[in-house]
Every structure is written in C-alpha cells, then in structure tokens.
Amino acid sequence: MKRIHIFGAAGSGTTTLGKALANELPFSHLDTDDYFWLTKFTHMREIEDRKKILKEDLLKYERSILSGALCGWGDSFKPCFDLVIFLWIPKDIRLERLQQREFQRYGNEILAGGSKQEQYEQFMEWASLYDHAGIEVRSKTLHESWMEDLTCPVLRIEGDYTVQERVKIILEYLRLNEKRSN
C-alpha cells in the first residue's frame, strides 16, 4: 500500500482524518486544497498547474495520503491509488461542523454586515446541496459516480464516527488486507 485517497463532502472530516492517519502510518499527508487554491478559498489555481504540482508531490512522497476531492480536475490520478476511503456523515452534523469551522476561520466577519457574510452564505448553501444534488456540483451523486470505475478497493465509512474510530477502522482494514495478500 503506497497511496491512499480520502474524500467526501465538505465538513466530512477528510483532512482531519488524513492528518491523523499519517500520524499512525509512515505516510506523508497531502491535501487537495493545497493544489486547488492559489490563495486559500478565494483564487483557484489553473487546472494544469494543480495537476503538475500534485504529480510532482506524488512522485516525491512514495507513501502518501491525499485528502479532499479530485473529481473533475484530478480524474487522471485515479489509477495512482491503492485504496480510496469515502466518508459520509449526516447532513445536520456536517453543516454544524462547517458553521463552527467557518466561525473559527473568520469570526464575526461571517455574521450579518460582516465582510465575509455573502461568501459564507454562498458556501453554506453550496455545502447543503451535497446529499441531494446531481453531478453538476460536488455531491454524493458525483462522488458515487466517480468511484464507479476505480480499479482499487473502496472503503466506505458512513456515519458519525470520531477521528479515532475512523483511524481504527482503517488500520483494521489494512491489517486484514495485508494478511490476505500474504
């Protein structure tokens, strides 16, 4: 096992899990936000630049865990992964996490009259679409479609688990599959 990809909806915990898993395994943690954004959450990097930088890092780090979504712009990386982990949590829990995260990032600027209010409201509206939208946006439907032609195993972790519980599930999965392949 050399490359693991963890993805799911915004607020599902992909980055947090990627970091925690990298602390347990001899893997480097990479996050798609670092490739997608030129300036975090305001200016997108050109697609070809994202791909080039990600490819360089995947070559640089022999064992890596990539968290975050690649759908659309990073489809060419699908064959690179030995395991894909899909995270899903109930919408109400996910949106509450996102509200807390955004408040920690921007404070009162997301409240009425704040400089980030409009951006925050648009982001939350977009995030709320995940469970019922079609493939035209980052949605569960798009993610399910993206997983259909993966050649590697997919481990689905669906439900409200703690980070530690998720890490335990993954380590157990890896241990069992290590035994099967020997």
What does each model-identified segment do?
Residues E125-N182:
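NTP-dependent small-molecule kinase module
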